[in-house]
A protein has these predicted regions:
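A structural signal for short, well-ordered beta-strand segments and their strand-loop junctions
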Residues: 9-13, 152-157, 174, 200-204, ...
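Active-site periphery "cap/insert" segments of enzyme catalytic domains
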Residues: 2-4, 11, 20, 54-193, ...
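SIR2/sirtuin-family catalytic core signature
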Residues: 1-20, 25-54, 193, 247-342
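A general structural motif
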Residues: 234-246, 266-267
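Redox- and metal-dependent alpha/beta enzyme cores, enriched for Fe-S-associated oxidoreductases
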Residues: 207-233
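Short, flexible loop/turn elements at secondary-structure junctions
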Residues: 15-16, 158-160, 204-207, 266
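Beta-strand-turn-beta hairpins that frame and shape the catalytic cleft
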Residues: 195-198
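Phosphate/oxyanion-binding active-site loops and adjacent basic polyanion-contact surfaces
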Residues: 20-28, 41, 114, 125-136, ...
């Protein structure tokens, strides 16, 4: 078969940056709870926070929903509560529980204040003064040189591990020369020579993105309000680059022969739906799941039977996988001979 630049697609989640000392979502929850218990300016949110947390957990168990409580489920719930009057369901709701009304404060102001405090902390937790621990991300660069075709990395992370470890002239992010984000930088005709061999699509935003009057720029300044989104309900926004990136992920997932998934917990229903669709339309497409920990019901979340041999697990961390395991030969051995793109 012909060899192109679309046979391998990468999808990375928080676990990919864990060994670079970037806290995962569950660790951020621990940080919030420590602040609530130990810092006076957080203490007033204690009852509200734990009420929301326990209600989310109870609702998940009651509905049989496989959803971990994490920073995203917390924030998407708080955002929905803060905007409850804009919901189409608002006229049907006779009232909220007395506990929620008490903890949320007048006009739900406490909810908005808690959102503000959490979102102010998030960039501090993710930003590193030194990205040396993320050196293993250069494995993407090494693989691309061996593969000899452009690669596409779809990231669910807000951190800058890739940007700090891969030379900017080899990495396409949609930004250049201080100009606003431009989606056309990701699209080239068959006759065009791509400007960079590695394309990075940050599906949930980035801590160095800033939006001003609907203009998205990449900022080097400290203390900006980063353009990041949370939770399934808010991730599908009718605004670029989010819609464009989701379209691109669907497009290249459907064109790929193997989707390499590193450190993703399968908690995003929209992403899971796109993975499910990719499996449904091609009986030979593979999912290679790189994670050192056992994941809860991956098969069910992507809509396949537990006997489906297209789902392949590699029980190592991202550091080991990117540093030594990921090679053209390794991926070639996973694919059937007639489907090898190399």
């Amino acid at each position: 078969m012909s060899v192109g630049d679309k046979s391998v697609v990468f999808l990375i989640g928080a676990g990919c940056s864990f060994e670079a000392d970037i806290p995962m979502s569950s660790s951020m929850i621990e940080k919030i709870e420590t602040k609530i218990e130990k810092e006076s300016d957080w203490a007033n949110f204690r009852e509200l926070y734990f009420y929301v947390k326990h209600t989310i957990e109870y609702g998940s168990k009651l509905g049989g929903i496989l959803q971990d409580f994490n920073i995203e489920s917390l924030l998407v719930t708080l955002h929905h509560l803060s905007e409850h009057r804009q919901s189409i369901l608002y006229p049907f709701i006779s009232g909220y529980s007395n506990d929620l009304i008490e903890y949320a404060g007048r006009n739900f102001n406490n909810i908005r204040e808690l959102i503000k405090k959490v979102e102010e902390e998030l960039p501090r937790w993710i930003t590193k003064s030194d990205y040396k621990a993320a050196e293993y991300y250069t494995g993407f660069d090494r693989f691309q040189n061996e593969y000899n075709y452009p690669i596409r990395i779809f990231s669910l992370n807000y951190d800058l591990c890739i940007e700090k470890q891969i030379n900017s002239n080899r990495l396409e992010t949609g930004f250049a020369d201080g100009k606003p984000w431009d989606g056309t930088r990701f699209t080239h005709s068959c006759d065009d020579e791509p400007d960079a061999p590695i394309y990075l699509y940050k599906l949930h935003g980035s801590i160095d993105w800033e939006r001003n009057k609907n203009i998205l720029i990449c900022s080097q300044q400290q203390g900006i309000k980063p353009e990041i989104i949370f939770g399934t309900g808010t991730k599908v926004q009718a605004v670029d680059p989010y819609l464009f990136y989701l379209y691109e992920f669907r497009k290249y997932a459907l064109l790929s022969k193997i989707i390499v998934i590193i450190g993703y917990s399968f908690n995003d229903h929209h992403i899971n739906d796109l993975l499910r669709q990719a499996l449904e339309v091609d009986d030979l497409r593979k999912l290679l799941i790189v994670n050192p920990y056992e994941l809860n019901n991956v098969y069910g979340r992507v809509g396949v039977l537990s006997t489906d041999e297209r789902i392949i697990f590699k029980s190592v961390g991202a550091k080991e996988f990117l540093s030594s395991t990921l090679t053209v030969d390794y991926l070639s051995k996973i694919l059937p001979d007639e489907e090898m793109p190399f």
